[in-house]
Regions:
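Consensus positions within tandem repeat domains that build extended binding/scaffold surfaces
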Residues: 81, 102-104, 124-126, 148-150, ...
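Structural signature of tandem-repeat unit edges
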Residues: 52, 63-77, 86-99, 108-121, ...
Length: 298
């Protein structure tokens, strides 16, 4: 730091801890009054005590004993396990943040997370076992993939996905029993294996441009009653496919619209579903057989 001397000039000043009073970093606070005494003269000012440590843009340490954290703008990435098992209610992620590492919030008590528009990448298992997390608004982010196991066993009730999203990873919403409805963005072309397996969804809106819905993507969703399509996007992919057993074990399913881009249906697509009364199949789909709609015999 610099000091202004009696001659009116500013020069560097060396300050020791003995010359500082009122400062404590034991508890994070928004405002703390600090006084510096040099040669009998005092100067007081306010400082902010951050609950985190940041090195070269990476979040490296989080202090305990807080309920809410607002990350400073200097954070560019959150590393693996950063908030794992933490007892925290709210985290405000800063504008400028680019990525969040594997299992960053694994088994934490977080209830609310504010996501920035600058976020581009999520890694796997981020919100695994986050029972208290009820809503995730990712709609303003720039992520292109929701990775594998993002919300497994989370208490999520509402998820808003960004228009930039192109892929939903395997088991992304596995065992999310509180999730009731979801609209999948129009640019999504791939839905991974068991992406919504045993979730609580009742309705799903699929984009017409989707070309790959992996096996058991909606396997055993006991409350799923309606799968509809929307959007004008059409992908002319001869291999576009809904893979086997995608909707097997959805006993309440009554309406199923197959996206316009799909060409191939896997076997056992609607296995065990006896309440389907409305089925819409695009003209481009290859011949449909009995085994597509039922469990094959062995």
């Amino acid at each position: 730091m610099t000091g202004k001397y009696d001659d009116g000039k500013q020069r560097p000043v060396k300050v020791t801890s003995e010359q500082i009073s009122g400062f404590s970093s034991s508890v994070p606070v928004d405002k703390q009054e600090v006084t510096i005494t040099i040669e009998g003269k005092q100067k007081s000012f306010s400082v902010h005590i951050s609950p985190v440590r940041v090195e070269n843009g990476v979040l490296t340490e989080i202090l305990k004993g807080y309920n809410e954290i607002i990350l400073p703008n200097s954070v560019k990435s959150i590393p693996k396990d950063a908030f794992r098992n933490s007892q925290i209610a709210k985290v405000v992620l800063n504008e400028g943040l680019k990525s969040i590492g594997d299992m960053a919030f694994f088994n934490s008590t977080v209830q609310e997370i504010v996501f920035p528009s600058t976020l581009e990448q999520l890694k796997e298992d981020i919100f695994y076992y986050c029972y208290n997390l009820k809503k995730a608004d990712l709609s303003k982010t720039k992520i292109t993939k929701l990775p594998a196991s993002t919300f497994v066993y989370a208490g999520i009730e509402e998820v808003l996905l960004p228009v930039t999203l192109k892929e939903i990873g395997s088991q992304a919403f596995l065992k999310t029993s509180q999730l009731k409805t979801i609209e999948i963005p129009e640019n999504v072309s791939t839905i991974g294996q068991e992406a919504f397996r045993e979730s609580g969804i009742t309705t799903v809106k699929l984009p017409n441009g989707v070309t790959n819905i992996a096996s058991r993507a909606f396997y055993y969703c006991p409350e799923l009653a309606e799968v509809t399509t929307y959007g004008s996007t059409f992908n002319d992919d001869p291999e576009a496919m809904i893979h086997p057993y995608c909707l097997e074990g959805c006993p309440k399913l009554a309406r199923f619209e197959i996206p316009e881009s799909i060409r191939i249906l896997g076997q056992g697509l609607l296995g065990g579903n006896r309440k389907v009364t409305q089925l819409t199949i695009p003209a481009n789909v290859t011949p449909v057989s009995y085994t597509h709609m039922t469990m094959p015999t062995t």
